[in-house]
Amino acid sequence: MTFIPDTAIFDAPCIFEDLEEVRKTVDDPEFFAQIQESYRDSGYELLGYSDQGFRVMSTNKEITSFEDFSGQKIRTMENSYHLEFWSALGANPTPMNFSEVYIGLQQNTIDAQENPYEVIVSNNLYEQQDYVVETNHLPHLISLVVSKDFYDELPEEDQEILIEAQEIAREYSREASDERISQRIETIEESGTQIITLDDETRQAMIDASAAIYEDIRESVDPGIYEAYMGDRD
């Protein structure tokens, strides 16, 4: 989100063990208060975060070690931190419009791509891939926002109602997302595409390879936001 520079913090890869840790971090009052101010500076009132789980990798090459990432031509978004991450893994990141990804996989223009399970299944990307690798490199967060001007004009009572409604919606959406991910995994497995869970050694190698990215993000975002989000993970 180039219009909210501090949201670059969400591009820090491989720092969470599970979704519970992600949600605990973004809901943490210290972190939330600081990132909320960044949204306000850009004209938004941040109410909370939902998510679609983690981003994972789909590929036609079996990944069983860190070295297996080497040389894979993977489609990414046009995001400098994403490009830096996959390059650090030894892959060949290739920015591409999402509308071209399915054909790119079909025609072997690219070897792999990365997205949350919901996107992989709803767009049938798994049909062109032999493996889905649970890299879980980034949480796929969804910002629940309204215009700051709109929010500020609301009576205090209505602001409280909006916040309460967001809390209910956030919890519901998280539960629905978890259930949906389980269904999407089942769909992928039934198709014959294999899901790979990485071992601890490979995960640690990915973290180690990300050290320079953590430093780049540290230099780009508010120090308080960085510390509250990263903790001692870097």
Residue ranges and their predicted role:
Residues 1-21, 30-31, 35-234:
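N-terminal secretory/targeting leader peptides
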